[in-house]
Amino acid sequence: MHRRTFLKYGSAGLFTLGMGGFLRHAYSQTAPQDESLLRDRVDPCFDNSPRVAPFTVPLAFAPVIDAVGAVQLTEARGEHVFVPGFRTPIWGYEGMFPGPTLVARRNVPVAVTFTNALPPGEDPSGIIIPNNSRQDPVDHPFRDSTTVVHLHGINTDGQLGPGGDGSFSSDGYPEGALALKNPGESRTHQYPNNGTPGQAAPIYQRPATLWYHDHSVHITSVHLYRGLSGFYVLKDVAEEASGLPGSAAADPGRGIEAGPLGFDVPLVVKDVMLAPEEIDGRPPGTLIYNNCSHFGAFGDLMTVNGKQQPFFEVANRKYRFRLLNGSDSRQYLFAFRVAQNLKSGPNEPFRYIGTDQGLLFTGVPEITTFFHANISERHEFVLDFSKYPIGTRIVMVNLLVDQNDERLFPIMEFRVTRVEADHSQADAWPAAAWAHPADVQPAAITRTFRFNRQGGYWSINSMQFDPLRDDAQPLLDTTEDWVLVNESGGWGHPVHIHLGRFKIMKIQGRAPNPGELTGFKDTVWVGPNQTITVRHQFWNFPGRFVFHCHNGSHEDSDMMSQFNVLPNPGTVGTGTLPGGTPS
């Protein structure tokens, strides 16, 4: 197929304006209210990826690394089989997607050394980009294979520079000292997993499901789409003693490390597009990246842990799942249905137990029948298969697409195939074990940030990202209320704030989703005509960090700002500090 023919295919699927962002539901409902308003109205810009029938291939698991002491990871080109019969060139940590799952322990430091072994330049053979996928309003020194690793959700150092460009670097800072600009370069990231090295109790960092990924300026979207991401699961003694499925107390040796035999299961959901035949000399199965004129890269092939719509054989007992929305731009409304009632429902009830920053701080689950998964969010839930006869099939579905769309509606299938004893519980956990003074600290100030579009670019407070400008200067070991405003009627933004965690204080324009008011977060969905107030914690580390829309195409088009955590003279005042728009 020639490029001209491909572009013809691509334009046929262009979207109608907007994306379902009005989540009008309460916990434990049988079905969403006004479900038609939730539909994902952005069709893939290409809809001819090769595929097999849903639930043909088994769920796959990334290798698990015990992250204690020193860990080495190499960013490399590799091949991956999303669909049987097609070998897709990817970029990945250790050349695989998803990258290895790192399992770390709270208050036990780990040093992870990342080495860039990616091909120099653009590596055009590994991806097809039918349009100008990037806008570069400012010059930057990065090549297309430059990388900067971010451990998403970690509380870690902001003073790792200055780099060659004179800026300080924090974990994931898109420009600065930790950039791997040339093949063969290595950088070591120090993760104390507690807040600060040698920190006395109480420890700040909560056990949680985090993830590591590339964060290079203007090319994050393409790099994540190629495969540069992996899980980082942080555990601790209290959680292991909780009796949750896969914990040491309930299921010794049957946690994440046990892979398909474990009862603590990581799932990364990601949509991609693959070339159905040779295009511009590139083989069938090559990744196609089309960000729909900077609105977002949507795929027509649903994958879980890198496999198209897989099945997972389970025992008739409880399982804990840790789900990451690893898509570039697609959001999901997940529900679970018995296979024979796939289209008619009802949705099966389940326990929702955790958000981005760990288990719910209430210490008890929420019973619900669905949850909204925003880009880059993590969700933890427990499915109890003991109530289903052997042979039952349960399907995870996405309610934001047409239920007749076999490509996008069914996500994966759980098959109840065997009997196993269950010594786990999922009704309570010791939330007090992770309490910290920051969690009850009042806000020192309120700032407002408006997420909009200015001069053809995505922007925050009508400004694009500038590493030489601080848009907020919070004081160290304080909290602030940030009002995140989206006045557009057509697009939503998953807003991610680096460094710490936040609590959602107020939601205007929609009802809360499961866990949003009972769990700590680092990413929040700010949909069209919505305003979300979050209380963010700027604890333990001074320095420069960023916050941004986590729709990769928006982020790369400079919907990102920078804050600089300043040393605290010892008093926390009120009023107006530099940066942001005071409220």
Task: Give names to the regions the model predicted.
Residues L73, V112, V149, D214, ...:
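Divalent metal-coordination and catalytic microenvironments
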Residues R3-P174, S186, L287-F321, G358-T362, ...:
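N-terminal, post-signal-peptide metal-ligating segments of extracellular/periplasmic oxidoreductases
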Residues T156-A179, V269, M273-A433, P512:
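Histidine- and aromatic-rich segments of cupredoxin/plastocyanin-like copper-binding domains
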Residues V338-L359, S488-T518, G552-E555, N564-P569:
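Active/binding-pocket-proximal capping segment
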Residues R134-S242, G363-V364, T369-F414, G489-G490, ...:
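Extracellular/periplasmic metallocenter environments
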Residues T115-P119, L324-S329, V485-G490:
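Short solvent-exposed strand-capping/beta-turn motif centered on an Asx-Ser/Thr pair
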Residues G121-N131, R226, R330-R337, W491-I497:
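Short, hydrophobic/aromatic beta-strand segments
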Residues R447-I504, D522-R544, H548:
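C-terminal substrate/ligand-recognition segments
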